[in-house]
Amino acid sequence: MALYEHVFLARQDITPQQVDALVEQYKGVIEANGGKVGRVENWGLKSLTYRIKKNRKAHYVLMDIDAPAPAVHEVERQMRINEDVLRYMTIAVGKHEEGPSAMMQKRDRDDRPRRDGDRPDRGGFGDRGPRPDRGDRDDRPRRPREDRA
């Protein structure tokens, strides 16, 4: 059996419970055709780079699959039929990654509390002080005006 990573995008207006039901449905299809589903990661509702079928957001789901090719073809066929699935992509991999995916690591990193001031060696915009290379406008000599008559 071959190893696959499968990502699909579900419409924004379905609930997370309906997304979980889709995952269970596709798990059942894979297992019925002699395959196994390993890790399943729900990346949540994220903004799309561009609109897909009039949707600006989508639920992202990653599945690690160990199944024969006909099982994957059947899942893809059912995803084409289902109106709740906007896009899907299946990629054959040599081995499945251990631990959380890059998207989950990024989410964990973003959820961490920030340090005080974030960068103590740098201040905000207001603490720059006077610029020594530029004087005040009052220090400049005035240009003579030409009288127009």
Curated annotation (Swiss-Prot):
RNA-binding among keywords: yes
GO terms for MF: small ribosomal subunit rRNA binding; structural constituent of ribosome
Biased composition (Basic and acidic residues): 94-149
GO BP annotations, alphabetical order: translation
Keywords attached to this entry: Ribonucleoprotein, Ribosomal protein, RNA-binding, rRNA-binding
A Gene Ontology term for the protein's cellular component: cytosolic small ribosomal subunit
Region feature Disordered, mapped onto this chain: 93-149
CDD domains to which the protein is assigned, alphabetical: bS6
Highest taxon, organism lineage: Bacteria
Family: Belongs to the bacterial ribosomal protein bS6 family.
Function: Binds together with bS18 to 16S ribosomal RNA.
NCBIfam families xref list: S6 (TIGR00166)
Name of the protein this chain belongs to: Small ribosomal subunit protein bS6
Taxonomic placement: Bacteria, Pseudomonadati, Pseudomonadota, Alphaproteobacteria, Hyphomicrobiales
